[in-house]
Structures are given as structure tokens and as C-alpha cells.
Amino acid sequence: MFRNQYDTDVTTWSPTGRLFQVEYAMEAVKQGSAAIGLRSRSHVVLACVNKAQSELSSHQRKIFKVDDHIGVAIAGLTADGRVLSRYMRSESINHSFTYESPLPVGRLVVHLADKAQVCTQRSWKRPYGVGLLVGGLDESGAHLYYNCPSGNYFEYQAFAIGSRSQAAKTYLERRFESFGDSSREDLIKDAILAVRETLQGETLKSSLCTVAILGVDEPFHFLDQEAIQKVIDTFEKVPEEEEGEGEAGEGEAEAAEAAPAERGGGVAGDQDVAPMEM
């Protein structure tokens, strides 16, 4: 039984009860650059990896402002993400105009999930190939949701999507219990450290990541590269200092071993040479 018999139409079920077109859209999310979100009781931080197509091109935006109290980070097809972020912005504006109050984050996420779900039921449409991390703050507190191309949505304390996101998830799973009481600065630091986990040995620089934050009495805004680099320097320089101290200790030990050898004459010198030849 071949898969390609059942994946030509989004409304065709396979005998095992799967919609392959929807699964393909979910795979597209895994191909995009990593996006990370985490929240405390008062703040939400969104971060993403800036991935350029080539050295000659600029990177595409992966984090969008929806309203002063809502932002979204995407992974997958950027064009689909732009369309959905525009839809979210329109919904927020319409709600504010009609009710003269900010749109609750949960309600916006439900509207977004309904829009994505319709695309899994119409033969003339295709699922959106993008995953969205929606972070926001309303009367009930800070929220972080993940919207899936299938139309499902889930609320998280912290989450990561996109390429090599499993490494970031592992880091977040070790730390998430402390996020609720984290300060603004600690939350930003944890977000950047999670981004570093997805780079697989590549040196983390402010040009490689984008960070946005919103919170109580703090509208949604992006951190500038200088602020991001200052945070990076706080944990990138520590290993270098420890390495320098280690090298100094090794140098002192070698000097201490060399002193008796010089006093002992040629025999000690031969003993020093032998291990190097082995």
C-alpha cells in the first residue's frame, strides 16, 4: 500500500487514519529555523535564529508584532507566517475597535486555530506550512501558545519549534520549573541560551538571533543587538576565563616539575623526554 495513493488531496484519508498533506505541512515547520518562547508570570520572551539563504542576502523576519500585548514567532514557510500574522493583527484591531478593550490572547489563538483547521477540510486549499508561537499578556496573566498546521493549539510554559529545536527543548525542560518566578533579565538570558543550543557548535552572536519581549507595563518590542550582545557576553566570557586560569595552573605545575629536573642533572632530563616519545 503506497503512501502516494493517499497524499494527493488534503481530504483523502489513508487506511491507517492519517492525512498525509497535513503531516507534510507539520514537517515543513521542522525545516524552518528555530523559534523559541518562554514565559514567567509577568513577561513573555520570543527568540528566533536569523538564518540567511546565502552570505549575500539578509535574513527574513521570524517575529512579528500583533499588538502591544501580543507577538508571534514563526517557523516554516515565512510567506504563510506573514499572511497569518496579518490576519491576527486584523482580528486584534477589529476587537479593539468594537469592544474598546484588548483582545484576549486565548480567543485570538482559537480564531487562528479555526482558520488553520478549515484548510484541512477543503479540497481546494492546502494546510498552512508554518507553526506559530503566540505570546501575549491579558487580564488572566502571561500566555504562550503553539498553533499547529493541523488546527490544534497548546499552551506551554516554554516551547521551541523549527530545525534542531529538540536541543532547545531539552534545555527548557531542565529549567522550566524556575521560569514562573524568573525576572525579566533571567528570562531573556534563558531564551538566548536556548537559541545557542540549536546552533550546534556555531559561535553565538547578536547578529544570529532576534529577541522580543512583552510584559506588565512593557509593550511588545524588540531588543537591539547591543542589548543582546551584552547578555551573550555574560555567559560566553566565563569559559574563556576558566580556561585561562587552567592554563596558568598547568604552567605553574610544569615549572615546579622542571625545577627539580634541572637540579637533578641529565638523568631527570632523560626521564622527561621518554614520555614524549611514547
Swiss-Prot record:
It holds the Pfam family Proteasome_A_N. Transmembrane segments: none annotated. Induction: Slightly induced by heat-shock and high intensity light. Residues 238-278 are annotated as: Disordered. Keywords: Acetylation, Cytoplasm, Isopeptide bond, Nucleus, Proteasome, Ubl conjugation. Disruption phenotype: Enhanced thiol accumulation and arsenic tolerance. Mutation can be complemented by overexpression of PAF2. The modification N-acetylmethionine is found at residue 1. Coiled coil: none annotated. InterPro entries: Ntn_hydrolases_N, Proteasome_alpha, Proteasome_alpha-type, Proteasome_alpha1, Proteasome_asu_N, Proteasome_sua/b. There is a cross-link at residue 51 (Glycyl lysine isopeptide (Lys-Gly) (interchain with G-Cter in ubiquitin)). It comes from the Eukaryota. Residues 239-255 have a biased composition (Acidic residues). It is found in: Cytoplasm; Nucleus. GO terms for cellular component: cytosol; nucleus; plastid; proteasome complex; proteasome core complex, alpha-subunit complex. The proteasome is a multicatalytic proteinase complex which is characterized by its ability to cleave peptides with Arg, Phe, Tyr, Leu, and Glu adjacent to the leaving group at neutral or slightly basic pH. The proteasome has an ATP-dependent proteolytic activity. Negatively regulates thiol biosynthesis and arsenic tolerance. Belongs to the peptidase T1A family. Component of the 20S core complex of the 26S proteasome. The 26S proteasome is composed of a core protease (CP), known as the 20S proteasome, capped at one or both ends by the 19S regulatory particle (RP/PA700). The 20S proteasome core is composed of 28 subunits that are arranged in four stacked rings, resulting in a barrel-shaped structure. The two end rings are each formed by seven alpha subunits, and the two central rings are each formed by seven beta subunits. The catalytic chamber with the active sites is on the inside of the barrel. This is Proteasome subunit alpha type-1-A.
